[in-house]
Amino acid sequence: MSLIESIRKQVTPIHPEGYVFIASFGVATLVLGSFFSPLGWIGAFATAWCAYFFRDPVRQTPLDEGLVISPADGVISAVGFFPPPPELGLGVEPLQRISVFMSVFDCHVNRAPVAGRIVKIAYKPGLFLNADLDKASEDNERNGLVIETAAGRFGVVQIAGLVARRIVCFVRQGESIGVGDRIGLIRFGSRVDVYLPGTARALVTVGSKAVAGETVLAELRAGANRRAFKSS
């Protein structure tokens, strides 16, 4: 194994979406530091934080059927039944929803909670309220995906927040995705909601910590054997 390969295995990858931001912070650091060294140190800290924010670590994703995996890093902020956003076309009856709130310190790369085919992508402009508020689901800017599976349709909604002002979607309508695949990113603090079909049973509670691509949020059948994994 070469030295470069060894370093790559030890260093957490940076998502390409962050390159322009990291480069901008780096240039600003050099310019400010040339005028006043304390500003250079501040800029260096900001550059390091930006690189940390856009980190994209490899995750060990359970592959067993019947499991719903967290789409985001963060804290479970809601578990309950809520009407899905109308633009998703999932009906007007309340569906079970699990919300994951991401702070500015969490990894913000979002992943598919289940494997399936993306049958709809719906973007809706809106406000930039605190993403931890209940009304953020209705009022904030958001981007929703509907994933069709053999067990039913799942809704995944990326919600912008007070600081987050840019939702990035990596996938296209009609595309087939695997569980744990990268589906998008939200810059600088936000929330992801997962709407589950009626057969799902939540396995997490409010306040629980979630890891994108790894934490099991719910199961579609009892007693799923969690033995198979993939690195993603």
Swiss-Prot record:
Report the principal subcellular site. Answer: membrane
- This protein's pathway: Phospholipid metabolism; phosphatidylethanolamine biosynthesis; phosphatidylethanolamine from CDP-diacylglycerol: step 2/2
> What Gene Ontology cellular-component terms does the record carry?
plasma membrane
Q: Where is this site: Cleavage (non-hydrolytic)?
A: G189, S190
Location of this chain's protein in the cell: Cell membrane
- Summarize the subunit comment: Heterodimer of a large membrane-associated beta subunit and a small pyruvoyl-containing alpha subunit.
Under what name is this protein listed? Answer: Phosphatidylserine decarboxylase proenzyme
The gene behind this protein is psd
